[in-house]
Amino acid sequence: MKNYHAPDEKGFFGEHGGLYVSETLIPALKELEQAYNEAKNDPEFWAEFRRDLKHYVGRPSPVYHAARLSEHLGGAQIWLKREDLNHTGAHKVNNTIGQALLARRMGKKRVIAETGAGQHGVASATVAARFGMTCDVYMGADDIQRQMPNVFRMKLLGANVIGVDSGSRTLKDAMNEAMREWVARVDDTFYIIGTAAGPAPYPEMVRDFQCVIGNEAKAQMQEATGRQPDVAVACVGGGSNAIGLFYPYIEEENVRLVGVEAGGLGVDTPDHAAPITSGAPIGVLHGFRSYLMQDENGQVLGTHSVSAGLDYPGIGPEHSHLHDIKRVEYTVAKDDEALEAFDLLCRFEGIIPALESSHAVAWAVKNAPKMGKDQVILVNLSGRGDKDINTVAKLKGIEL
């Protein structure tokens, strides 16, 4: 796929994306777009971004050959891009560093964020402390119960965590509240969106900050294996870790790209979070147009996933576009497959993955045996699983 360019000047990726917000937010988004366009062309901005990624986050994150897991499965060699080794334990911090630098450049003293699994909340609280800003994090009440360790982490870092009791009490509702708050305090507040979704320019901006993942991986895989992987795979909720891995590979036609949505209890049930795989129609949510789980009246449907971070009814607009142009294949891993992959990676490699990342590992577990021993699968291990041990223990009937 040569000459891939997106989004267009209106923030559209094909027919997805754009700017669907109330009039009151338009000036804030235009101000943000202008600031980002200036920063994007300022070498000093990127130099500072890279410095922080190196000295604060600990990048580059390594690629690691999961040799014992590969041998156990028989077939393709599985390599992991170790985003779990970043400061704060996931890929989220790549993006929050970039947005915090932008907030500071715009003179904003306060940041707000939404969070599902709590990883983006922790990463936002972390950079707020790093840059001396106040931070409020909106989190669904159900997610707070699932992710208590991360809630406490955010508070330790000085953030105020605001529980959201409306709707499904998960990520979607947290995002609604955060957008409402931004409208109310747009003058002094910067909204750090945690995924490659939301109104323009957020999907492009988040991608640009996250594509450090794929850029590093390309150089590292070349050095480690003398070639690029046959397949690069990542889990997809809103889709920031996935677009970070995929974007630098889009024009590399020999590399198959696979996005793994949350299959929950199965896409033939109502309990999943897989808008593309389940054939959901296009809708508008949180300021952008994309595939969206909704009923015949356009009401957003409830979602289910064992992982709080994939529990989202929409998907980032660039993913919808990459699906439309058939550059990326989207599929699912169900809860039980993700949990099996979680166990396998723990036992064979001594790595406890996030339940989100376990969905991508599950694809490799299922497909590596069907491939040749000389073939290579690169899995984006987007985060570590410390935050999920309570969930997993509960599912195994173990009291912690």
From Swiss-Prot:
PTM annotation (N6-(pyridoxal phosphate)lysine): residues: K92
HAMAP family (alphabetical): Trp_synth_beta
GO molecular function ontology, one term from the record: tryptophan synthase activity
Family affiliation: Belongs to the TrpB family.
Organism in which the protein naturally occurs: Neisseria gonorrhoeae (strain ATCC 700825 / FA 1090)
Name of the gene: trpB
Name of this protein: Tryptophan synthase beta chain
Top-level taxon in the UniProt lineage: Bacteria
Recorded metabolic or biological pathway in which this protein acts: Amino-acid biosynthesis; L-tryptophan biosynthesis; L-tryptophan from chorismate: step 5/5
Known catalytic reactions: (1S,2R)-1-C-(indol-3-yl)glycerol 3-phosphate + L-serine = D-glyceraldehyde 3-phosphate + L-tryptophan + H2O
